[in-house]
């Protein structure tokens, strides 16, 4: 009896220990999925605001270019490529969360018209699959197939991101129409400067919180960073500014600083950009009609030339007579 109780107690102890270990692991080792674009997905119902601004710009403050290439027109139920280009100098390094330097990641969001969606694997040609490599795509929201996000992925490998897109067929989808549609894109390279809760990352400028003389600068042990004590000019109080590891100090002890004056350099080397293109969902019957029209024009020209030659022969015969 005692042995059974002891075994049961040990089993429960192991289960509790394992649960505690898993919980601790989740807290101390956050998943990669907690990186962008999950921030936008968690905080914004739609990635594009009513003003046209894509919400990624709220965290990635620096402006950079991004290009989108897509066909001017597509036929219904057709797979085509939408290519997002995120150019940057791959030799540069960014400040990582631990303060060290590392390569830049890139990410993109593609906002397609209603009815357009990511092409299913069985519809993607082999050649296009080879171009995609190991890229993983996801929808911004469950059920919203027209908004696709990708990233973060290594910028050295994916400065160009290819989205395989499937156009809708108005014959089977009553919500789709043969019209001209806009496609919106947002793309970033590097880490953001602000987290969704409004706090700063270590990839931005840190400024003085008060006006006064820098009394002391202390380098923090362990993870790194600095603690800066400013003796305020008015009142003689002390303001403490904490700088995380990453940004480099550009001030020294004894220096007089004003409120909001930079204490560090700006370590950010990345940025965000957005753009748009237009695409026409083309009705095949219009193309057939256009081809028929061109054919009729060509035939008319041929008959006109033949008629002219016939007329010239008649005139020549009359002159000889």
Curated annotation (Swiss-Prot):
Membrane topology per record: Single-pass membrane protein
Compartment(s) where it occurs, according to its Swiss-Prot or TrEMBL record:
Plastid, Chloroplast thylakoid membrane
Instruction: Name the source's superkingdom.
Output: Eukaryota
In this UniProt entry, which cysteines form S-S bonds? none
> Which GO BP terms, alphabetically?
photosynthesis
InterPro entries reported in the protein's UniProt record:
Cyt-f_TM (IPR024058), Cyt_f (IPR002325), Cyt_f_lg_dom (IPR024094), Cyt_f_lg_dom_sf (IPR036826), Rudment_hybrid_motif (IPR011054)
Coiled-coil-forming residues are none
Look up the record and report any one GO term of the cellular component aspect.
chloroplast thylakoid membrane
MF terms from GO for this chain are: electron transfer activity; heme binding; iron ion binding
Tell me which UniProt keywords the record has, alphabetically: Chloroplast, Electron transport, Heme, Iron, Membrane, Metal-binding, Photosynthesis, Plastid, Signal, Thylakoid, Transmembrane, Transmembrane helix, Transport
Residues bound to heme are 36, 56, 59-60
**Residues annotated as signal peptide:** 1-35
**Which cofactors does the annotated protein need, by name?**
heme
Segments crossing the lipid bilayer: 287-307
Which note does the record give on the cofactor?
A: Binds 1 heme group covalently.
Oligomeric state and interaction partners are given as: The 4 large subunits of the cytochrome b6-f complex are cytochrome b6, subunit IV (17 kDa polypeptide, petD), cytochrome f and the Rieske protein, while the 4 small subunits are PetG, PetL, PetM and PetN. The complex functions as a dimer.
Function text: Component of the cytochrome b6-f complex, which mediates electron transfer between photosystem II (PSII) and photosystem I (PSI), cyclic electron flow around PSI, and state transitions.
Q: Which family does the similarity line name?
A: Belongs to the cytochrome f family.
- Could you tell me which HAMAP family the record lists for this protein? Cytb6_f_cytF
What name has this protein been given in UniProt? Cytochrome f
Organism ancestry: Eukaryota, Viridiplantae, Streptophyta, Embryophyta, Tracheophyta
Encoding gene per record: petA
């Amino acid at each position: 009896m005692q042995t059974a109780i002891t075994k049961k107690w040990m089993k429960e102890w192991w289960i509790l220990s394992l649960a505690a270990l898993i919980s601790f692991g989740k807290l101390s080792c956050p998943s990669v999925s907690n990186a962008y674009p999950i921030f936008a997905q968690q905080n914004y119902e739609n990635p594009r605001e009513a003003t046209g601004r894509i919400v990624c710009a709220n965290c990635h403050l620096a402006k950079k270019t991004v290009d989108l290439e897509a066909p001017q027109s597509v036929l219904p139920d057709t797979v085509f490529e939408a290519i997002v280009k995120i150019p940057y100098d791959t030799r540069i390094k960014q400040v990582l969360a631990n303060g060290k330097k590392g390569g830049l990641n890139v990410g993109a969001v593609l906002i397609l018209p209603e009815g357009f969606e990511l092409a299913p694997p069985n519809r993607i040609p082999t050649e296009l699959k080879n171009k995609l490599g190991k890229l993983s795509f996801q929808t911004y929201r469950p059920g919203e197939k027209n908004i696709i996000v990708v990233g973060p992925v290594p910028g050295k490998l994916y400065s160009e991101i290819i989205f395989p897109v499937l156009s809708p067929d108005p014959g089977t989808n009553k919500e789709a129409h043969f019209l001209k549609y806009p496609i919106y894109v947002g793309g970033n390279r590097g880490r953001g400067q602000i987290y969704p809760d409004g706090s700063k990352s270590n990839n931005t400028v840190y400024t003085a919180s008060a006006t006064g003389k820098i009394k002391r600068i202390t380098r923090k042990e362990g993870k790194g960073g600095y603690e800066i004590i400013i003796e305020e000019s008015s009142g003689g109080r002390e303001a403490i500014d904490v700088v995380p590891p990453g940004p480099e100090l550009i001030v020294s002890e004894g220096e007089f600083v004003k409120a909001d004056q930079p204490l560090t350099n700006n370590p950010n080397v990345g940025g965000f950009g957005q753009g748009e293109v237009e695409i026409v969902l083309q009705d095949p019957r219009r193309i057939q009609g256009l081809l028929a029209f061109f054919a009729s024009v060509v035939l008319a020209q041929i008959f006109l030339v033949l008629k002219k030659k016939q007329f010239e022969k008649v005139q020549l015969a009359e002159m000889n007579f």
